[in-house]
């Protein structure tokens, strides 16, 4: 199944560890986002989720620390013809395992420096590089610009600031826009999309 957490508590109306439940049990519960319940919407299998996204959006598949079988996951991505659409996010060793299976599978490393990103240059499908908000906002405000100067696509997320955006506070989003980052991850794409359109950025 497709589940970010070890439990279903945060993203469904149920409770329990994924590892201690079968899929039929998990299907008893509806999906939710914060307190918003999507009645009738169920936890998908990875195949179902990828097929729903195929040809429409890029998929950020976060498998860091989740013991996902590399060969099985790679085979599914290949079978569905989505090697150019699914971006694997994990630790370096696991990312390179995917590269050894299929160099066309997009890998999505987390980096702490431009030099970290340069170490992936031999892998053409290393396209998008994630960095922390701390890196940009405190340590190096021009980090995204430095990454772009090397030809990399810098990316970060503002998941910790979603609650602020929901009440009209866009300070964190404004700082990311100013950083010239190429991608911003959020659980509230409709809010970010509307804000970017209002500013003439989409």
Language-model features: where?
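Short loop-to-alpha-helix "cap/lid" segments that border enzyme active sites
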Residues: 57-58, 63-202
């Amino acid at each position: 199944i497709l589940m970010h957490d070890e439990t279903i508590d945060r993203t469904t109306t149920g409770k329990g560890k994924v590892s201690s439940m079968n899929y039929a049990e998990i299907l008893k519960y509806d999906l939710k986002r914060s307190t918003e319940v999507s009645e009738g919407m169920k936890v998908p299998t990875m195949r179902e989720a990828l097929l729903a996204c195929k040809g429409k959006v890029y998929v950020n598949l976060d498998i860091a620390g989740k013991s996902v079988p590399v060969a099985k996951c790679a085979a599914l991505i290949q079978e569905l013809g989505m090697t150019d659409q699914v971006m694997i996010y994990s630790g370096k060793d696991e990312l390179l395992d995917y590269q050894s299976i299929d160099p066309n599978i997009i890998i999505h490393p987390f980096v702490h420096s431009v030099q970290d990103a340069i170490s992936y240059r031999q892998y053409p499908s290393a396209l998008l590089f994630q960095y922390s908000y701390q890196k940009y906002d405190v340590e190096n405000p021009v980090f995204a610009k430095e990454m772009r100067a090397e030809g990399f696509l810098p990316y970060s997320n503002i998941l910790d600031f979603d609650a602020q955006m929901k009440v009209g506070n866009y300070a964190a989003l404004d700082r990311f826009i100013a950083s010239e980052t190429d991608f911003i991850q959020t659980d509230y794409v409709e809010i970010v999309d509307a804000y970017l359109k209002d500013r003439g950025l989409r």
